[in-house]
A protein has these predicted regions:
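Interaction-mediating elements
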Residues: 1-167, 171-172, 179-190, 194, ...
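Gram-negative/organellar outer-membrane beta-barrel architecture
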Residues: 10, 46-51, 153-286
Length: 286
C-alpha cells in the first residue's frame, strides 16, 4: 500500500518467551519504493480516456498500490460502485473485463496500460426464485427489478436485494442472486435464492391497579398473510400465509374505564400489477 512493490519476507521466527507468550520476529526486505507513471487505455469505445481517468483517480506520481488499481478498474463486482467496472455494468456490459498490464518499469516508476474488453450489452432472460416454502413465487417476482427482456444493470441487482430484505419475511443475509451469464446469446439468467424467516409479531403486557382492576394490551401482526387461503385449512401454519398481506389486531384495556379494539388488513399490491397499497381497518373504543 505504500509503494513497496518488491517487499519480501526473508525469514520469520516464533519464540516462547519467559512470560509464556509468543514473540514473532520477521525479517523484511522492503526494496525500492515505486510510484505510478503514465497510465493509458486500450479497448475503450464506450467511454473516453478522460472519463475513465476521472473514475480511476490515480495520478502520475502517486505511490504504487496494485490493490487500489485493481479495485478502481473493477476487477471484481463491487456493491459500493464508483469504479470503472460498475460504470460499465450499470449500462448492461455484464461481460466487461479490465486487465492492468505493466508496460514499463524504470527507476522508481511503473507505467501501465489498462486493457479493456467491453463485450456486448446483456439482457435478462430467465428469472426464477427458489428457497421459498410458504411465500408464493409471484410475491417475490413482482418485487424484482431484474425483468426479462430488460437491459442488465448492476444497480438492479443491488436494489432488488435491498427491497426484498425490506419485505420482512425473508432473511436479508440469505438473499443471494445466482447469476448465470450466456456470452454467446448476450443474455443472463438469475435465480434469486431466498430463505424465509418468521415475521409475525406479538405484543403482550398486563398489570393490575387498585380501583381500575386489570389493565393490559394484546396485539398480533402477521406480515405474510393470505386471505384467499382462509378456507384451505391445509395451508394454515398456524394461519394462512404466502401472499405477502398484512393483518394486525390489537386489544387494549384500562380496567373498567377504557377498552379499545383495532383491526387492519393491508394488501400491498392491489390489482397485482403495480405497487398500490390498500388498507382497511376497524376501530372501536369504549
Amino acid at each position: 500500500a505504500q509503494g513497496y512493490r518488491d517487499a519480501n519476507i526473508l525469514a520469520d521466527t516464533i519464540i516462547n518467551n519467559q512470560k509464556g507468550n509468543l514473540d514473532i520476529h520477521i525479517k523484511l526486505e522492503e526494496g525500492h519504493k515505486y510510484y505510478f507513471g503514465n497510465i493509458s487505455w486500450k479497448g475503450n469505445t464506450k467511454y473516453s480516456d478522460s472519463v475513465l481517468n476521472m473514475l480511476l483517480a490515480i495520478k502520475k506520481g502517486d505511490p504504487y498500490n496494485l490493490e487500489t488499481l485493481n479495485k478502481r478498474v473493477g476487477k471484481e463486482l463491487s456493491m459500493e460502485g464508483g469504479d470503472i467496472g460498475s460504470l460499465y455494468q450499470d449500462d448492461g456490459y455484464l461481460f466487461f473485463q479490465a486487465d492492468p498490464v505493466e508496460i514499463s518499469v524504470y527507476n522508481d516508476t511503473i507505467d501501465y496500460e489498462i486493457r479493456l474488453r467491453e463485450g456486448p450489452q446483456a439482457t435478462y432472460d430467465r428469472i426464477t426464485v427458489s428457497g421459498n416454502n410458504k411465500t408464493k413465487d409471484y410475491v417475490i417476482l413482482r418485487e424484482l427489478r431484474t425483468i426479462p427482456g430488460n437491459k442488465y444493470r448492476r444497480d438492479d441487482i443491488i436494489r432488488t436485494q435491498r427491497e426484498l430484505s425490506q419485505l420482512g419475511f425473508l432473511d436479508p443475509e440469505k438473499i443471494v442472486p445466482q447469476i448465470v451469464p450466456n456470452a454467446d446469446a448476450g443474455t443472463v439468467d438469475i435465480n434469486w435464492q431466498v430463505e424465509e424467516k418468521s415475521a409475525d409479531q406479538l405484543e403482550l403486557s398486563a398489570g393490575f391497579g387498585g380501583g381500575i382492576g386489570l389493565t393490559g394490551t394484546l396485539g398480533v401482526t402477521f406480515n405474510n398473510f393470505s386471505i384467499k387461503n382462509i378456507g384451505k385449512k391445509a395451508t394454515w401454519d398456524p394461519l394462512p400465509s404466502g401472499d405477502g398481506q398484512k393483518v394486525s389486531a390489537r386489544i387494549q384495556s384500562n380496567g373498567k374505564a377504557f377498552r379499545s379494539y383495532n383491526f387492519s388488513f393491508t394488501e400491498p399490491w392491489l390489482g397485482g400489477k403495480k405497487r398500490n397499497s390498500f388498507t382497511i381497518g376497524y376501530s372501536n373504543t369504549k
